[in-house]
Amino acid sequence: MTDVALPTAAPAAFDLPPDSVGVVAPQRMHFAEPLKLRNGSSIAGYDLMVETYGTLNAARSNAVLVCHALNASHHVAGVYAEDPRDVGWWDNMVGPGKPLDTNRFFVIGVNNLGSCFGSTGPMSLNPATGAPYGAAFPVVTVEDWVNAQALVADAFGITQFAAVMGGSLGGMQAVAWSLLYPERLRHCIVVASTPKLSAQNIAFNEVARSAILSDPDFHGGNYYAHGVKPKRGLRVARMIGHITYLSDEDMAEKFGRELKTDDIRFSFDVEFQVESYLRYQGDKFAEYFDANTYLLITRALDYFDPALAFGGDLTRAMAQTQASFLVASFGTDWRFAPSRSRELVKALLDNKRPVSYAEIDAPHGHDAFLLDDPRYHNLMRAYYDRIAEEIGA
């Protein structure tokens, strides 16, 4: 792998809040050594996009890895000089004086293999053919992502993270870290996540994938060669997903049964505000996301089940962990309900592992983990204060 320089944020040419990490620049890490995948195949000569915030201390003990969810990326915080509107997806959590304080911690965001934001994925050129991988890109798993992230840590000379943190799918990666590399993280922070998908969640993913696969513009996953994108399928997939990210309470408050116009029109066009919102979200998503990536990531979600190798016994699976845990859930999250977080907490307690648990009564459903709720952020701030005290940050 090429040498890694620890980047510093570029000077801002525009006004930013004092608690912003500022203008940031991603870096591309190239790995020549093949990465063995869980499916038995391997991928060589791959790239991972990485962003960092804060300063790695001399002991390299203050690093925190932030793992991203389905449609996010390495761009966790800050803005890009070429597009100051492109704010990091967890910017309210990461920055100077924020819960994950970059004055004390060195924060790393990694874009996972198979994504469409610069890391090697279906849109990348397959060296064997000179054309985009497309449908030929190998199916990847949460464990594969974690193994690749461990190589990023090696490149920075980080032998142990102060914490590995993630929400939703990112939380699954944090759990996988605690199992695959138990000695390489002091703390595991799991937010709005689950130890495995329920049958209902797998079903949602299947319906979303079916929308993409049945789009005439999908072309078996090789739509790049045809100069098209399966936008209709991707739009429907996003609409389905977005419904599951919001609570009934939140949707009622935002939209209720408000009409888009003054009166009903007795048509099958958009009549209600909630329909307009979902179509807008679907159209926006279809413009920037890749359909093959959506298929890969939702399948990785489906496959994650650390208890499977232990006959379905999560307590036995979690016996491998050494980290201290913070697990947080949200009362109105029906995608990954609090009961799923409590399963994880029980398995940890059964193993006498140190774990703190909080269930936050927020009205915003699954997406609450991305929002600036004072109770949620105070919880995270207090926990990171504890970590900082432990490591002398």
UniProtKB/Swiss-Prot annotation:
Transmembrane segments: none annotated. The keyword Transferase applies. InterPro entries: AB_hydrolase_1, AB_hydrolase_fold, HAT_MetX-like. One of its GO terms (cellular component) is cytoplasm. The keyword Cytoplasm applies. Signal peptide: none annotated. It is found in: Cytoplasm. It catalyses: L-homoserine + succinyl-CoA = O-succinyl-L-homoserine + CoA. The record marks 335 as: Important for acyl-CoA specificity. NCBIfam families: homoserO_Ac_trn (TIGR01392), PRK00175.1 (NF001209). PANTHER family: HOMOSERINE O-ACETYLTRANSFERASE. Homodimer. This is Homoserine O-succinyltransferase. The lineage of its organism: Bacteria, Pseudomonadati, Pseudomonadota, Betaproteobacteria, Burkholderiales. The gene is metXS.
